[in-house]
Amino acid sequence: MAEPPVIRRVAVALFEGFTVLDVYGPVQAFASARLARPDGSIQRLFEIVTVAEKAGPIKSGEGPTTHADHAFADAPAYDVLLVPGGFGTRQAVNNAPLLLALIAASRRAAITTTVCTGSALLARTGIMDGRPATSNKVAWDWVVQQGPRVKWQRQARWVDDGDLVTSSGVSAGIDMALSVVARLQGMDV
């Protein structure tokens, strides 16, 4: 009998002004990773939770609100942390409690991922210093100012540095998430 699949948990960090596609593109990639069982049923391989400074509604940059399931401090254990970008990052880089929460959240995760300008938030914390990373090309100059000691890779669609995987703008987050799915659950998924 085959061993049951390992169900992984993804924690999606939310903040005011996040970009909807930065969150829901990768979420769809993780949520679509499923395994067909011999009895015909389908087993999801990733569980998705949302986290923020405090649980409750978080308004995106495009307008729709997403509910944060947990405050960072109260989140259940997770394997992957996803940090989206968005115009809200311009204010969030100066939000010390959020940055401290992201440092702690990243330490809890086996893999920390960023989409678009989400890399600016982690760069601002210093946890990406000396590591290769990428980000949104339109906001490139602003992003690299947030972490001058990061080894920025401008041409990359995404950069996989083991426990840190960063992607460039918006839809590149889907490709990045699919690469993490393949790493954690195999190419056949």
Kindly give the residue locations of the regions a language model identified.
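Short, surface-exposed amphipathic charged segments that create phosphate/polyanion-binding patches used
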Residues: 64-66, 148, 167-168
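Structural detector of well-ordered beta-strand residues that form the stable sheet scaffold
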Residues: 112-113, 134, 153, 165
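Crotonase-fold acyl-CoA enzyme core
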Residues: 149-150, 155-162
